[in-house]
Amino acid sequence: MIVEQINDGNFQEKVMEHSKNTPVLVDFWAEWCGPCKQIGPVLEEISDEMKDQVIIAKHNIDQEPNTPTKYGIKGIPTMLLFKGGELKATKVGATTKSNIISWIKENI
C-alpha cells in the first residue's frame, strides 16, 4: 500500500472522516529533517504490513503549515494517530519499526 500524501485542504476528509472506519496515522515531516527521512521507509513497510488495520499518511509541514499548527506540532517527526474521528495518540521523534507497530497496536 502506498503512503498517502495529505494537505491542509483534504485533512478533514482523508484523516478525520476515514478514521471513523479505519485508524489513520499521520506523519508530520519536512524535506530537511534527517530523522523524518529515516522513518519514511519504515512507515511504508508498516503501511504494507498493516494495510487492513491502519492507514498511513504523510503531511509536509513546510508546504502545508495550518494543520500542524492546529495540532501543536513543535518538533518533527511527529506521528498522530486518529481513530473514530478523533486524535487518539501522539508520538514524537524517530524510533524503531517495532516500537511504532507496538504503539499503533496499543492505540487501535
Predicted regions and their residues:
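Thiol-based oxidoreductase modules, predominantly thioredoxin-like and allied folds used
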Residues: 5-7, 28, 39-65
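Short pre-active-site segment immediately N-terminal to redox-active cysteine/selenocysteine motifs
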Residues: 22, 29-32, 75
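A short beta-strand-turn-helix
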Residues: 5-24
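Short loop/turn elements that flank and shape the SAM/SAH-binding pocket of Class I
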Residues: 12-14, 64-67
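N-proximal helix/coil linker or "cap" segments that precede and/or mark the start of modular domains
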Residues: 1-3
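The canonical Cys-X-X-Cys-His
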Residues: 33-36, 79
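Non-catalytic, surface beta->alpha helical segment in thiol-disulfide oxidoreductase systems
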Residues: 75, 80-108
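Structural cue for short, hydrophobic secondary-structure segments
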Residues: 27-29, 81
